[in-house]
Amino acid sequence: MTVQTAQIVKNYIGGEWVESISTKMEAVYNPATGEVIAQVPLSTKGDVEQAVLAANEAFKSWSKTAVPKRARILFKYQQLLVDNWEELAKLITIENGKSYNEAYGEVLRGIECVEFAAGAPTLMMGKQLPDIATGIESGMYRYPIGVIGGITPFNFPMMVPCWMFPLAIACGNTFVLKPSERTPLLAARLAELAEEAGLPKGVLNIVNGAHDVVNGLLEHKLVKAISFVGSQPVAEYVYKKGTENLKRVQALAGAKNHSIVLNDANLELATKQIISAAFGSAGERCMAASVVTVEEEIADQLVERLVEEANKIVIGNGLDEDVFLGPVIRDNHKERTIGYIDSGVEQGATLVRDGREDTAVKGAGYFVGPTIFDHVTKEMKIWQDEIFAPVLSIVRVKSLDEAIEIANESRFANGACIYTDSGASVRQFRETIESGMLGVNVGVPAPMAFFPFSGWKDSFYGDLHANGTDGVEFYTRKKMLTSRWEK
């Protein structure tokens, strides 16, 4: 199958590309043009059953495959991703809409995740103590847990799947992936390259669809763990239903990330970082900067700088040269975003840059221009809700204490940033902010794959985060062996 020209996306089960049991289809759009580029099946629980059984059968041999051999397959896979990065970046742009440069960055992050997974055997090593008592020793050994289900979002169609299945299979598990029905083509290409790298049949499976596939994974007794990334309501649902069915669950949810700008901040740096963090990927990322709390003395300067830089942003098809801001994913999301902009005006915020008025918004595709509100308060919907779009809210505060207090009132707690040259302020921020990933003079403090992606509050449901040693813990279980050896 050549996914770029596929009219109907197929499922990948047991190493074969197969049609879904379901005859129901959903269109896959290029969000920059509104054109239909493929049809994706809305698969059934019957499709899930086939994939899980294939994964379970493959687990019998894959879990016994020597760890170095698993790693060598992943190293080859990593090289294939490098060799095909241009194709992958273009495919991301076509089905997701983000700029080609941002898509290239996503490909690199995905490759980094695979590199980490290829080295995971080092982290899988157990521990031993030779003398817990006279003549008695104990040791801990790690083992895979079985079939893993992964449910991934549209906004990072390569990076998030590469968070999940490479590390899971490196640890000896097998995997059933449900990619977003809005961006299924990239996932299919990832499977093709995994097969080319030598991954055995059934180790990685893909079932396309929506609610039925999610519920099928959550309910199936052979699925031992679920990794999820998506919106807060669905994350909470996945966590509750998955744990009710006695599965391990990590569910990464929504965000409302605050950036704090203090009087001593380098405003040129802060402006550059905030613009990129707020409007990159059309604001459709869980680490986007969506609220800026700024001390009153410099607020006018910062707002002026932000508007000036936002006016320079090139909006359009991500494949076009110099484009920074692409479309949001669908027309209904565009209308939802415009509804939030309307509500901000109605609730009394000052609209200093209106993304509804950009030329691209009035043409084909699902575009919303960079939008900036000033004088936002925490009673407003644009402060409270995750908009997931290029909309930035500015809150004026009197002090760092007030900025932290406001940020901590949000129910979301993925990331937070501070712009300052004060070590004392950084320390106070680090110790008192209620958020899992922090940045100092950095707009998007997303960690590398060898660290956990550690959201708090309603930004995460579970105990073990994605990536890093948390990821290895999540995808393995332990055996303790205690032995007595007497002369």
UniProtKB/Swiss-Prot annotation:
Pathway: Polyol metabolism; myo-inositol degradation into acetyl-CoA; acetyl-CoA from myo-inositol: step 7/7. Its EC number is 1.2.1.27. CDD domains: ALDH_F6_MMSDH (cd07085). One of its GO terms (molecular function) is malonate-semialdehyde dehydrogenase (acetylating) activity. The keyword DNA-binding does not apply. It comes from the Bacteria. The active site is at residue 286. It is an enzyme of class 1 (oxidoreductase). It holds the Pfam family Aldedh. NAD(+) binds at residues 154, 178, 181-182, 231, 386. Disulfide bonds: none annotated. The keyword NAD applies. InterPro entries: Ald_DH/histidinol_DH, Ald_DH_C, Ald_DH_CS_CYS, Ald_DH_N, Aldehyde_DH_dom, MeMal-semiAld_DH, MSDH_GmP_bac. Homotetramer. Belongs to the aldehyde dehydrogenase family. IolA subfamily. NCBIfam families: MMSDH (TIGR01722). This is Malonate-semialdehyde dehydrogenase 2. It comes from Bacillus thuringiensis (strain Al Hakam).
